[in-house]
């Protein structure tokens, strides 16, 4: 059986945390900031964790990633 390869696009978008979680960057950060409040823009700068529902699927894609 062949080895499972890392999904390279996913590996570039997610980072492993020390506890084994997955960190991701937020959406809605590329343009059209004039329609967002200062508070929204500030909060969009922070990264967030992958939700439990998506974690299993994404973990399989980036299985070999450290």
Swiss-Prot record:
Molecular function GO labels: structural constituent of ribosome
GO cellular component: cytosolic large ribosomal subunit
Chain segments annotated as coiled-coil in the UniProt record: none
Keyword check for Ribosomal protein: yes
Gene3D superfamilies xrefs: 4.10.410.60
BP GO annotations: translation
UniProtKB keywords: Ribonucleoprotein, Ribosomal protein
Basic residues composition bias: residue spans: 1-16
Pfam families: Ribosomal_L35p (PF01632)
HAMAP family the record matches: Ribosomal_bL35 (MF_00514)
PANTHER family recorded: 54S RIBOSOMAL PROTEIN BL35M (PTHR33343), LARGE RIBOSOMAL SUBUNIT PROTEIN BL35M (PTHR33343:SF1)
Name this polypeptide is given: Large ribosomal subunit protein bL35
Source organism of this protein record: Lactococcus lactis subsp. lactis (strain IL1403)
């Amino acid at each position: 059986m062949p080895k499972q390869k890392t999904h390279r696009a996913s590996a570039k978008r997610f980072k492993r945390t020390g506890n084994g979680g997955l960190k991701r960057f937020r959406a809605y950060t590329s343009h059209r900031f004039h329609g967002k409040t200062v508070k929204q823009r500030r909060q969009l700068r922070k990264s967030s964790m992958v939700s439990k529902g998506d974690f299993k699927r994404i973990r399989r894609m980036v299985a070999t990633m450290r």
